[in-house]
UniProtKB/Swiss-Prot annotation:
Superkingdom field: Bacteria
Protein name as catalogued: FAD transporter
TM helices/strands, residue ranges: 21-41, 49-69, 96-116, 131-151, 167-187, 199-219, 248-270, 283-303, 324-344, 357-377, 392-412, 417-437
Mode of membrane association: Multi-pass membrane protein
Family according to the record: Belongs to the multi antimicrobial extrusion (MATE) (TC 2.A.66.1) family.
Source organism of this protein record: Shewanella oneidensis (strain ATCC 700550 / JCM 31522 / CIP 106686 / LMG 19005 / NCIMB 14063 / MR-1)
Role noted for this protein: Flavin adenine dinucleotide (FAD) transporter that facilitates export of flavin electron shuttles.
GO cellular component: plasma membrane
C-alpha cells in the first residue's frame, strides 16, 4: 500500500481538500437518503411516519456502533499503512470485519425476536406495532450489510481514498430513490408493499453498495485477505479495535441524549420552542457538514503520519484544520445573521415557532466555529489513540457545561436564556480545545505500529 494519495508527502492543505470534497458529497448523499425515505413514507399517512419515528432509537444504537468500529478501523489501519506494514493491515481489517459481522448479526437476531416487546416499551401503540414489525424485519436483515459497508468504507478512507466511498454511497442513494416509490406505492409491475417496500428498497441498495465496497477492498486495492483462524491474534486485534470503538460509539450516543434533555427543558416552558429546536437541529446538521467532512478526512491523515513517524506533520494538519473551520464557520454565519427570519419561515408559519427559530438561527451558529474546533479536536484524539480523552471532552461539554448552563439560562430568561447557554458552552469548549491542540503530542506507547 503505497502513499497513493499523498498523505505522507504532498502539501497538507491540498491533500485535506482533495479528501474532504468527496466526503462532503458522501455526507450530503446520506442526508438525502434519509430525507427521501421520510418523504415517501410520509405519503402513506401519519401512522406510517410515526412508526418510522419509533425506530430511531434502535437505528441510532446500530449506527453508533458502526461509527465507533469505523473510527477504530480508520485509526489502526492508518497507523499500519503509514508505517508500511501492509500485511498486518490486511489481517487487522479481516478481523475487524469478522467481529463487526458477528456483533451486528447477533444484535439483529435478538432485535427481530423482540420487536413487539421492545417497541411497546418505547411507547408504540397497537396501530403502529404491525407497521414497525413490517419495516424492522427487513431492516434487521440488512443491518449487518449496512455496518459492514460503513466499516469497509472507513477502510478505504484510511488509505486516503475518500472518492470511492462517496461514489458508492451516491449510487446506493440513487438506487433507493428509484426503488422507494416503485415498491412503496406499487407503480407499474411492482407490488404495493407500503412501509415494507421502503425497507426492501433500502436493503437492496445496501447490498449493491456492499458488493462494490467489497470489490474495491478485496480485488482492486487488495486491502483484505483471508487470514488463518488464530484466536490469540484475533483477540489482540479486537482489543486494539475496541480501545477506539467503545468510547467513539458512546460519544456518538451522548449528543442525541443531551439534545433530548434540552427538548424536555423547552417542553416545560413552551411547546413552540420544542418545534423550533427540532427544526434548528436539522438545520445545524447542514451547517456543520463541512466540519464533518473535514474531521472524517483528518483522522486517517493524522493516523498515517503518526504511523510513519511524522508527528509534526500530523499536528500541522490538525492546527490548519482548526483555523480553517473557525474562519469558514464565522464567514458562514454572516448571511445567516441577516436572513435569520426568512430562513426560519421556510420551516414554519406559526408566529411563535418563527420567533424562537429566528432567535435560534441568530445566536447558535455564531459559535459553530468553536463547536467545529471541538468536533475536529475530539475526532483527532482518536487518531492519537486517546479515545477516552475524546469522550471526556464531549462529556465536559454536554454534562458539565451545556446542561447546567441551559438549566440556569431557562431559570433566568426562559427559552432565550436556555438557547443562549448553547453558544456560550461551545465558545468556552472551543477555546479550551484549541489550547489543548497546540500542546498535543504523540503518546510514547503508540509511536510505532507494533505497539498500537
Amino acid at each position: 500500500m503505497k502513499d497513493r494519495h499523498g498523505l505522507l508527502s504532498a502539501p497538507i492543505g491540498r491533500v485535506l481538500l482533495n479528501m474532504s470534497l468527496p466526503n462532503l458529497i458522501g455526507i450530503m448523499t446520506i442526508l438525502g437518503f434519509s430525507l427521501a425515505d421520510t418523504f415517501f413514507i410520509s405519503q402513506l399517512g401519519t401512522e406510517a411516519l410515526a412508526a418510522i419515528s419509533f425506530t430511531f432509537p434502535v437505528t441510532l444504537i446500530i449506527s453508533s456502533i458502526a461509527i465507533g468500529v469505523g473510527a477504530g478501523v480508520s485509526t489502526n489501519l492508518g497507523r499500519l499503512i503509514g508505517s508500511g506494514n501492509a500485511p498486518q493491515a490486511k489481517v487487522f481489517l479481516h478481523d475487524a470485519l469478522l467481529l463487526t459481522f458477528i456483533l451486528i448479526a447477533s444484535l439483529s437476531a435478538l432485535g427481530s425476536i423482540f420487536i413487539e416487546p421492545l417497541f411497546s416499551l418505547l411507547g408504540a401503540n397497537e396501530t403502529s406495532l404491525p407497521l414497525i414489525h413490517d419495516y424492522m424485519m427487513y431492516w434487521y436483515v440488512g443491518a449487518p450489510l449496512l455496518v459492514l459497508l460503513m466499516v469497509g468504507n472507513q477502510g478505504l478512507r484510511s488509505t486516503g481514498d475518500t472518492r470511492s466511498p462517496a461514489m458508492i454511497m451516491t449510487l446506493a442513494a440513487i438506487i433507493n430513490l428509484i426503488l422507494d416509490p416503485l415498491l412503496i406505492f406499487g407503480i407499474g409491475p411492482f407490488p404495493r408493499l407500503e412501509i415494507q417496500g421502503a425497507a426492501i428498497a433500502t436493503l437492496f441498495s445496501w447490498l449493491v453498495a456492499l458488493s462494490l465496497s467489497g470489490y474495491l477492498l478485496i480485488i482492486k486495492h487488495r486491502m483484505l485477505e483471508r487470514a488463518a483462524f488464530d484466536i490469540d491474534r484475533m483477540r489482540a486485534n479486537w482489543s486494539k479495535l475496541a480501545h477506539i470503538a467503545q468510547p467513539a460509539a458512546l460519544m456518538n450516543l451522548i449528543n442525541p441524549l443531551a439534545n433530548a434533555v434540552i427538548m424536555a427543558m423547552l417542553a416545560h416552558i413552551d411547546h413552540s420552542a420544542v418545534a423550533a429546536f427540532g427544526a434548528g437541529t436539522r438545520l445545524e446538521s447542514v451547517l456543520l457538514i463541512v466540519v464533518m467532512a473535514l474531521s472524517s478526512s483528518l483522522m486517517p491523515f493524522i493516523a498515517q503520519n503518526l504511523g510513519a513517524g511524522q508527528p509534526q506533520r500530523a499536528k500541522q494538519a490538525l492546527l490548519l484544520s482548526l483555523k480553517f473551520i473557525l474562519v469558514f464557520q464565522t464567514l458562514l454565519y454572516i448571511p445567516l445573521a441577516f436572513f435569520a427570519q426568512p430562513l426560519a419561515s421556510l420551516f414554519s408559519t406559526d408566529p411563535q415557532v418563527l420567533e424562537w427559530l429566528s432567535f435560534y438561527i441568530l445566536v447558535l451558529p455564531c459559535a459553530y466555529g468553536p463547536l467545529g474546533i471541538v468536533i475536529i479536536f475530539a475526532t483527532a484524539l482518536n487518531a492519537y489513540h486517546r479515545p477516552m480523552s475524546s469522550l471526556v471532552i464531549n462529556l465536559c461539554r454536554l454534562v458539565l457545561l451545556m446542561l447546567p448552563l441551559a438549566a440556569l439560562g431557562s431559570y433566568i430568561d426562559g427559552v432565550k436564556g436556555l438557547l443562549l447557554a448553547l453558544p456560550i458552552t461551545n465558545l468556552l469548549m472551543g477555546i479550551a480545545c484549541y489550547y489543548l491542540a497546540q500542546r498535543i503530542c504523540e503518546p510514547v506507547k503508540a509511536t510505532t505500529a507494533d505497539t498500537l
